[in-house]
Amino acid sequence: SGKTTLLRTLLGAVRIMSGDAHVDGKVVGRGSRPSVGYVPQLETIDWNFPVTVEEVVLMGRAMDSGIWPWPRKADRRQMMELLERLGIGAFRHTHIRNLSGGQQQRVFLARALIRSPRLLLLDEPTSGVDIKTRDDVLHLLVDLNRDGVTVLLSTHEINAVAAHLPRVLCINHGVIADGPPR
C-alpha cells in the first residue's frame, strides 16, 4: 500500500513525479541532504565481506562524506553509547553475520542513529525480533522523539506498537487516517 515507497521518497531514493516533499525545511531530491536516518526492512550485507558491528555502525558516520573518514574519538564514544543503549555493546567486535536477525536490526538502527538525524525512517523495525527487543526498540524511539527526533515507521504490527506511539497514520488502499491511537 505504499509504506516503503513513502519512506524511500522522504529519503530521496524515489523520484517524485509531481509536488515536493520537505524534510527539515529542505526539498527532498534537490541537491540538499536533510538529516535523515534510515533503517530498511531487509538490510543487505555481502556476507562474504566480513565486517564487525563496530565497522557497520561507523559506516553511518561516513554516509555524509565522499570518502571514508577516520573515526574520531567522539564517533567511537557515540557508537559505544548507542550499542550499550541498544543492548548489543558486547558484540562490538563480532562479525555481523554471526548475530541473530534482531541483533542485526539493532546494529542497523545504531548505524542510522550515529548520524544524529532529525528524522528517523524505519521500515518494519520490529519484524523478526522478540517481544523484549521490540519493546526496548520502541522505548528507545519514544525517548528519541522526546529528544526532538521525528520518528516515522512502517509496520504491520499496529496493535503491538500503537501503545508506544503518540500519533498513528494509517494508509490503506490510498486512504489516510491519522491521530492518537485508540
Where are the language model's segments positioned?
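Helix-to-loop junction immediately C-terminal to a conserved catalytic motif
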Residues: 11
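Catalytic Walker B motif of ABC-type/P-loop ATPase nucleotide-binding domains
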Residues: 120-123
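Conserved ABC ATPase "signature" region
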Residues: 58, 72-91
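Conserved ABC transporter NBD signature motif
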Residues: 19-32
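Conserved switch/coupling elements of ABC/ABC-like ATPase nucleotide-binding domains
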Residues: 173-177
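Conserved ABC ATPase signature
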Residues: 95-99, 103
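H-loop/switch region of ABC-family ATPase nucleotide-binding domains
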Residues: 155-156
